[in-house]
Structure formats: structure tokens, C-alpha cells
Amino acid sequence: MVKKIGLITSGGDSPGMNACIRAVVRTARAEHIDVVGFYRGYEGLIDDDHIHLTKSKVSNIIHRGGTILKTARSKRFMTPEGIQMAVNTLQKHQLDGFVIIGGDGSFRGAQELTKHTDIKTVGCPGTIDNDLVGTDFTIGYDTAINTVVEAVDKIRDTAESHDRIFVVEVMGRDAGLIALRSAIACGAEAILIPERKNDLRTLLDRKKTWRQTKKSRIIIVAEGDENGGAVGIGNLLKLEWPEFDIRISILGHIQRGGNPTCMERVNASLM
């Protein structure tokens, strides 16, 4: 019988993590299960930096971005000593289960943890990259793409006013799903993602066509693109297309913040 579980948020933060924390705690408490939260992911597990989570401690957080448990990437956890310290913490608190909210790296950590303990472990997919199997949408993805769409719509306004081409970089080191979906929603004229190689040549071949039609364009690039992201591509286009006014915009960490969307809150609550 499960009496007590542990909970962490790990890796890069994503909007909706707080909604998921709330759902875990409220569901557990409804079954009279205690929840111990550890701060800063696996780092907090190693250091036993914990808090006893109650329904009152997770009230009014469903709408907030970030994570009340903080998050981090832990190099110590990848060492035998670090893993043993984490296992010792789990045993000290007599946990019957352990919940990890995070991305692929966090799940690999959970997999490693299960090799050293028989505690039942559950992973909730929390990453803006949407690159985990088993779910159509990870926690954070919907909010991130909505943030991108809002930003690119504004960039489109100024691009149109000045007849400029904007190369916009979005997050996605190994996965181009943020770039792909937001490009469709924004009506971007071109997209470059890690999953498709050699698309830059196709883009360069559009020079004649683009010169004869409208002058303002949006090119969305995933940061993991093989050509060096927006900076690499933008600088190359400036050399290849000197007649165009080309600007570079990197959206950065705004994609990981902000209030989660309605869809995000519902998905995170149901997971």
C-alpha cells in the first residue's frame, strides 16, 4: 500500500509544471498519501532539501509559470556517489513511490535511479520541446508555441513596415517541433529544423522568386539547425542576398516562461 511519495521537477523548466505539481499533491492527498517535494530536482534529492507538500501549499499555483519546487540539472547525480546519496534520501523518507516532472534527461536519470532501488517511479513529461514518446503534447509545449506565435506576429508587423527579412530563432536543440508548429501558425515563408538536412540550399535558391514578390519575409530556425542557428543563417544570407535588408531575432528564454495556456493547465492536471 502506498503511503508516501516523493516529487521533483528536473531539467529545464516549462509552463505547466506547477499545475502538474498541484495535480499530483491533490490526487495523492485525496487517497491519504503524503507527498515530499525536493527542491532543485536531483540536486535536492541528493542534499535532502525537501518540503512536505499539502493541498494548502499548492493552492493558487495552477496559473503560474515556472515551478515552486525549483529545478536544476545535476552533474553530481551522474556519479555513483551522487546516485547513492539520492537513494539514501529516498530510503530515509521511506518513500513508496517517486514522481519526476521533466524531459528526456530527467527520465534518463529516473531510469538510472530504478537500477538502484525498487521504489515505483513515474515520469510526467515536462518540456517545451515536445520530444518525448507516449504523449501528443508535453507539459510546456503549447504555452511555448503560443509565446512564439505572439512574438513572431509582432515581428511580422515591423518586417512588413520596413520590407525586411527576419530570421527568427526558437528553442529546439535536437527537435524542431516548436519551430515547425509555430511556423505553420505564423505563415512563415521558410523553416529550418534539425530533422531536415540541406534545406539551406533550397532556401538560397528562392532568391529570384523572393526578389520578384513581396519583400518582407519570416524565416523560423530551430536553435539546433546544422547551419548555426539564426546567427549563422542570417549572416550567410546577408552575404548571399546583399539586396535584402535582413535582421536576426533570437527569442530565447521567454519561451520557457509565462502563464500556462488553458490547454496546458488541463493536460498537466490530467497527467
Question: Where in this protein do the model-derived segments appear?
Answer:
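N-terminal phosphate-binding or glycine-rich loops at protein starts, especially the Walker A/P-loop
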Residues: M1-I46
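Short glycine/serine/threonine-rich phosphate/pyrophosphate-binding segments
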Residues: D13-V24, I46, P80-E81, F98-Q111, ...
